[in-house]
UniProtKB/Swiss-Prot annotation:
The reaction(s) this protein catalyses: carbamate + 2 H(+) = NH4(+) + CO2
Protein species of origin: Klebsiella pneumoniae subsp. pneumoniae (strain ATCC 700721 / MGH 78578)
Designated name of the protein: Putative carbamate hydrolase RutD
Pfam family of the protein (one): Abhydrolase_1
Gene name per UniProt: rutD
GO molecular function annotations of the record: hydrolase activity, acting on carbon-nitrogen (but not peptide) bonds, in linear amides
Catalytic activity, EC: 3.5.1.-
NCBIfam families attached to this UniProt entry: RutD
Domain AB hydrolase-1, first and last residues per copy: 14-119
First-level EC class: hydrolase
Gene3D superfamilies, per the entry: alpha/beta hydrolase (3.40.50.1820)
Cited function: Involved in pyrimidine catabolism. May facilitate the hydrolysis of carbamate, a reaction that can also occur spontaneously.
The keyword Cell membrane belongs to this UniProt entry's keyword annotation: no
Gene Ontology biological process terms, A to Z: nitrogen utilization; uracil catabolic process
Length: 266
């Protein structure tokens, strides 16, 4: 699996891995890069089955497989220890890694994640799957912003959304890959194991998230010992895109508290 590894801002700078949601694209974190790259060595990647790592996924594809793929790629690149910032599915990958490879994960920042899929989120995905089966990639892509962004934000950016739709359709990961990745997401359940997560953990949510209710992050914070929760009042599921300034401040402050070496080394 190909990783995009930025230069370290100085020797020994902490490594921060950025993991996207179901879309899988490393470009999802574009609005965060400038806010983080002066303090951390950033690693982004397209999830297997998407983008630069396109290709058919095996039967029985699971969250543990996703986490194992990322860990193996990081090891091959000589990265033994890292913090992970994950959005939705990316947050689940972070949880899996923190449990499977606790020696490697220095900290987690979990954005609009969950312990187990809520009935509301399951309903949303059922609707989206029906759209995929009935209308293919175009229907899936055109519906996606409704679950990601607040209405007023979308209404003010129609040309941008149309351009993003066209790009997403042209680079669509494929129906079979999407369904396998979605199935892995739906089956993930950390409700019995989250208490074993020992690394510092920041949880960020948005109060108006249509896809993943903010209450899921509150439950997650209760389950992970010592974790901290910051709830943004606005921004939707993709709050790191719609209100990047607020999100970046929260993330920078959280990473600085969890990874103090980033301050002391300078």
């Amino acid at each position: 699996m190909r990783l995009n590894i930025a230069p370290a801002p100085w020797p020994g700078a902490p490594v921060v891995v950025l993991s996207a949601g179901l879309g899988g694209g490393g470009g999802y974190w574009l609005a965060q890069r400038a806010a983080l790259e002066e303090q951390y060595q950033l690693v982004s990647y397209d999830h297997n089955g998407t983008g630069e790592n396109a290709g058919p996924l095996p039967a029985g594809y699971s969250l543990a497989t996703m986490a194992g793929e990322l860990f193996s790629a990081l090891q091959a690149a000589g990265i033994a220890r890292f913090a992970l910032v994950g959005h939705a599915l990316g947050a689940l990958i972070g949880l899996q890694l923190a449990l499977d490879r606790p020696e490697a994960v220095s900290a987690l920042a979990l954005v609009n994640g969950w312990l187990s899929l809520s009935p509301h989120t399951r309903r949303c995905f059922q609707v989206r799957e029906r759209l995929l089966h009935a209308g293919g990639a175009q229907a899936w892509v055109e519906a996606q912003p409704l679950f990601l962004y607040p209405a007023e934000w979308m209404a003010a950016r129609l040309p941008r959304l149309e351009a993003e739709d066209a790009l997403a359709i042209s680079h669509f990961q494929g129906k079979e890959n999407l369904l396998k990745r979605l199935q892995a997401l739906k089956q993930a359940d950390f409700s019995r194991r989250a208490s074993a997560i020992a690394c510092p953990t920041l949880i960020i949510s948005a109060a108006d998230d249509l896809l993943v209710p903010a209450s899921c992050s509150r439950v997650l914070q209760t389950a992970i010992p010592g974790s901290q929760l910051v709830e943004m009042p606005w921004g939707g599921h993709a709050c790191n895109v719609t209100d990047a300034d607020t999100f970046n401040t929260i993330l920078r402050d959280g990473l600085s508290a969890m990874l103090p070496v980033a301050r002391e080394t300078r």
